[in-house]
Amino acid sequence: MTDTPAVDGNAVARIAAYAANLTYEDLTDLTVTRARQVVLDTLGTALGGNPTRLGRLAADYATTMQPGNEASLIADGRRTTVEGAAWANAVMAKHLGMDDAHRTCGHVAAELVPLALALGEYKHLDGRTLVTALAAGYDTIGAIQPAVNEPQRVKGLDQKGQSGTLASSITAGVLLGLDEEKMAHTLALSMDMACGTEQYVYDSGLCDTKDLLSGYAARNGIYAAKLAAFGFRGPPGALDGPYGYYLAFGDGFDPVYLNGIGNRFVLSETGFKPHAGCRYVHACVDATQELLKSGQPPLDDIVSIEIGTYEEAMTPNFRVNYRPENVGQAGFSLPVAVSVVLGRGSWYREDIEAYDEPEIRRLWPLVTVYM
């Protein structure tokens, strides 16, 4: 059977051609350095996520439901299938909320790095191939996520499970050595696996979805690449077609979205979170820590706290939650963040878990948030 080639020049074909032909030698020194940092950072976050309830549950599920000897679980020692390891390690890497953060592409490493490590281990690939695959994945999400970011936000759609899946498929395709045609089908097939909403921010603490979405993306990226390698085909218009991703999750396609492909490396632009929790509270955390440099005031003497911020940091309203019911909700809340940092000096997982201590809780209603 002869495969139908991907349509030349459309969005899927252009991204696929770029990824299939990208080499390690094409990358800038900063991109290579940042790739190393991203891998180490993700390993660290996964190590921290491993002993938690969700980390253990994910590891136990992967080894029970997907038994195999293809790849390792981080900090665990047990082995499972490639898909099982990528899924479980991605869940662990996401759980602490300390994964990387790109200004427009969001959190990417928790999806791509566990996938790359699992496939790299299984295929006995070298570090240069892994770095190249990560760069291709980041560039894919850089061509897609900025175009849909605002519409997704309004609709409550989740970036990790959606554009994260598309990026994961390209990273998997590079690691499997797919040619342009197979790469195009990989990306196209992954579009219909992109999923997820952010309802978990309202039901935080009552569900595990936030972290499972990273696992879905890592697993589905591998699945799409394997399907394409086996001969399955995806719709050539998966991105820019009449019912493609750009319109389904955004406002439609504009060729300008692809201008960055081959001209910049999104991986080199990603950053690392100095604090846990939602990155929209981090400016507030930094400002509070700066105030504390002149000495910590007695908490009983505080009568009011004002936070001047920007629209994205206080909308939707879960970001200004004065009555969080659990640690998950507390991690998104500006009033809680400033209260915790005033009391404890930092904003790591163990600090967020102390959100409900009486002297900290007294501060919550004293906070006014405004633009």
Q: Which residues does each PLM region occupy?
A:
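Terminal-appendage/accessory-domain detector
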Residues: 1-106, 205-219, 226-371
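Well-ordered alpha-helical scaffold segments within catalytic/enzyme domains
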Residues: 49, 116-123, 169-176, 224-228, ...
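Hydrophobic alpha-helical hairpins/lids featuring a short glycine-rich hinge
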Residues: 90-146
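Well-ordered alpha-helical segments within folded domains of soluble proteins
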Residues: 109-117, 162-171, 218-223, 283, ...
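Aromatic-lined, polymer-binding surfaces characteristic
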Residues: 140-166, 214
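Structured all-alpha helical bundle cores of eukaryotic regulatory proteins
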Residues: 152-155, 160-163, 183, 190, ...
